[in-house]
Amino acid sequence: ALAYFFGRELYKKLNVPIGLVYSAWGGTPCESWVSFETAKAVGGFESTLNMYEECNFDRDAILARDPGAEHFQKPTLEYNAMIYPLRIMPIAGAIWYQGENNVGNNVQYEPLFKGLINNWREIWGNNFPFYFVQLAGYQQPVEVQPGSQWAALRWAQQKALELDNTGMATAVDVGETDDIHPKNKQEVARRLSLLALKNTYGFTDIIDKAPELKSYSFTNRKAVLTFSAPLTVKEVALPRGFIMQTPTGQFVKGRCTLENDSTISVSGTFTGAPISVRYNWADFPNGNLYGENDLPVLPFRTDQMDGVLNSIETVKTDSNDKTVDVVTTDGVVVRRNADHSSATSGLPEGVYIVGSKKVLVK
């Protein structure tokens, strides 16, 4: 359905027949769609890949006798059968909607998914556009859920945007609590088509992205977040979907105020500056920030964002002083005038700048 609706949206604008090569198998993990070499380079699949090499001699006899109940979920299977044979066909690009079967393996997913994109481009000999869908919300809503595996997988997907000629359409706001495959495929396809129409087919007037976090600053109990374009708050009067990490490492719900059309302040009932802020970080998040073209602001976490400016206050770094300031690596002052001997005592695990030195807290 998604591929059909995507093609239909392109046809409305291009007014020419759209060719779609549908190569998909439900319930498969990302590693099923990459080459042996890519899976081996990413790591984590050694036992299966070694078995492949050992069984190659007797492969036909083994498969005829018992292919295995979950053979379609094995590394490289769909790649070998459903992707590699297509490499002789010229294509304009690829769209991808997958990830549910990799939830829980979020750290591995980032290099795996990037490897897939590079792998496919290599065998086609073409740096074609690769547009993909960020997973929809799923399961029962939880207001403060920093350990969400679904949110972590979405973040791993988002990291693929670091590759050239990629784009992501989020489905985070069209999910259903009890259906891992939500029915609103038309909206997801529309968002994918906006990416293709603007970046592949040259419709430069199309808005294909929501506002992005441009800068932030942390002060006592408060974060101020500035976005790249005006925001629209839907459903209720105030922004929602934010959680804050307190100086003790605990996460709490953030109370939000819209300062102007592109700036939000988030506050909490704790003492000190927050360590980080996350937006739409849950299995089934309820964030309500949108931009033009009804596109939702993507989930984010300030503690893992490159290229976003943060306000760094004047920090005491002189190691000869009796006290020092303690700062996170993304510039948040978490302690002022702390004694050298106990500067990081009680802080969450991570790397901090204590005075003029980096310190690892375990």
Question: Locations of the language-model features?
Answer:
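C-terminal outer-membrane/trafficking sorting elements
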Residues: 309-362
